[in-house]
A protein has these predicted regions:
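Short secondary-structure boundary/capping segments within folded domains
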Residues: 13-14, 43-46, 80-82
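Pre-Walker A (Motif I) flank of P-loop NTPase domains
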Residues: 15-21
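Short, well-ordered coil/turn elements that cap or connect secondary structure elements
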Residues: 47-49, 67, 85, 118
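Conserved substrate/cofactor phosphate-moiety recognition/catalytic segment
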Residues: 51, 58-70
Length: 135
């Protein structure tokens, strides 16, 4: 179990796993860059993530390639891939939630409410609208 006490020199950017993080802000305000920096801070620690899943709105997106993701998705994947064995990070980057199907919305809600707390998953989500984000 991770804690703020060990190691004593823990950086504020090395958030205790598992966690949920929501980054809200307009276009070009540094949301994705902040999420990448938090991920990289974990990777430089003694307990890095073993898996990284990126969920984004474009299959052509290359901005996360330098983080060597395990998989890149354009839809919320089946939640069975999160088996709880490996320390996992999911980054949902500027994913459009208003046009999601009911099944996709259900998967996202289950991921945020259950998977992040019971399956060894930390989830970071960036979104551009303060008013339309997932509850």
């Amino acid at each position: 179990m991770e804690s703020w006490e060990k190691p004593k020199n823990r950086s504020p950017g090395h958030i205790i796993h598992p966690f949920k993080l929501l980054a809200l802000g307009g276009t070009g305000k540094g949301k994705s860059n902040s999420l990448k920096n938090i991920f990289l801070k974990h990777q430089s620690s003694s307990k890095p993530f073993q898996k990284l899943y990126i969920i984004t709105c474009s299959e052509e997106s290359t901005e996360w390639d330098d983080c060597e993701p395990t998989e890149l998705y354009v839809d919320i994947p089946d939640l069975e891939i999160f088996d709880g064995e490996d320390k996992t990070c999911v980054i949902i980057d500027d994913f459009e939630t208003m046009k999601m199907s009911k099944d996709q919305y259900r998967k996202l809600a289950t991921m945020m409410r259950y998977v992040c707390t019971h399956r060894n998953v930390s989830c970071m989500l960036s979104y551009q609208s303060f008013f339309d984000c997932v509850p």
